[in-house]
């Protein structure tokens, strides 16, 4: 909920005040994957369009806009690209670019990095564009 989001932002800001730095250089994370997972969508055919989790990526973008890290890493399942016929992923990319980040998107396989799983993941790395 919006109240929980605001409370979390407030706690992070208070913790930052206690540190020597007032800035966050890197944010790493992503919303829960159930709404974007192809398996999850197959299980919840009738309710998936109304699932509030489809829009949790918007909170990630809000975090980026509030804390303005130099770099961020966003992770999720490959199904995020096709969920909602691609509209959520398109909106995610546009929203990130609109707040001043250039992004690179890759699909990675966990086992290529020593993880004992063959899971594929979409990774978005964003870099804050410096204003001239």
Where do the protein language model's features map onto the residues?
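S-adenosyl-L-methionine
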Residues: 1-21
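Short glycine-/small-residue-rich Rossmann-like dinucleotide-binding loops
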Residues: 32
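N-terminal Rossmann-like NAD(P) cofactor-binding module of classical short-chain dehydrogenase/reductase
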Residues: 26-28, 73
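Class I S-adenosyl-L-methionine
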Residues: 17-21, 36-132
């Amino acid at each position: 909920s919006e109240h929980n989001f605001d409370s979390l932002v407030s706690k992070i800001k208070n913790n930052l005040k206690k540190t020597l730095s007032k800035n966050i250089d890197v944010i790493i994370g992503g919303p829960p994957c159930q709404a974007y997972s192809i398996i999850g969508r197959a299980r919840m055919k009738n309710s998936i369009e109304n699932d509030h989790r489809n829009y949790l990526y918007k909170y990630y973008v809000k975090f980026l806009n509030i804390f303005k890290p130099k770099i961020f890493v966003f992770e999720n399942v490959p199904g995020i690209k096709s969920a909602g016929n691609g509209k959520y992923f398109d909106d995610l990319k546009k929203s990130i670019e609109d707040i001043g980040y250039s992004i690179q998107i890759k699909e990675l396989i966990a086992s290529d990095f020593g993880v004992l799983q063959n899971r594929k993941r979409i990774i978005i790395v964003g870099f804050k564009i410096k204003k001239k």
